[in-house]
Amino acid sequence: LAKKPALAFAYHMPRRNSPEYYAMGLLDQILAEGDDALLRQELVKRKGYTDSLNAGINMLGNMFDYQGPMLWTVSLFHDSNIAADQIMQASDAVIDQVRTKPVDQATLQRAMVKLRSDLYDNIEQFSGFGRADLLCSFALFDDDPARINHLEEQFARITPEMIQKTAEQYLRPENRTVLVVETKAQAPEQKSGN
């Protein structure tokens, strides 16, 4: 059984390589990656619901090395005196900000810098294995290993309005799955039956 309660929520991703897919990559940076990320600011710094959160597209790799359906996932551990519903309400309030109005240009530029840094970290990881992983993924899934040379261009095409439209379409509650993990003390008593 869990020693500490946890919460995860995930949204279905847009089709790979679509403009919305690249917008979701930037939304991941805006909402969850780095100390300036909106969810991190709200859940960790302002509310103190958790000391950290994990998030990303394709939790078993990166946003480029998969083919097929995928999720953008956020997960965190929290204290037992904080209800999962409280955390979801705070998360929804933050996500609604990007769903209802475009992000400003400074936020988009910070997201691009973080994304570029993340991309080059992926490429250089494990003494170049990251580059091989991306080349293989683009060759296998897209028949286009040269796609690695054009990733930044794809992200640079994304506007604040595209980010809002993508958030509105994909980051809605009906497109989400929520997982709540409770400790034994929190779980309702189960009766055994015949």
PLM regions and their residue ranges:
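Bilobed periplasmic-binding protein-like "clamshell/Venus-flytrap" ligand-binding domains
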Residues: 164-182
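M16 family metallopeptidases and their MPP-like homologs
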Residues: 3-15, 41-156, 177-182, 189-193
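Active/ligand-binding-proximal structured segments within catalytic/core domains
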Residues: 9, 19-31
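Generic alpha-helical structural context detector
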Residues: 28-32, 41-44, 168
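Short beta-alpha junctions and helix-cap segments that line functional grooves
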Residues: 26, 151, 165-167
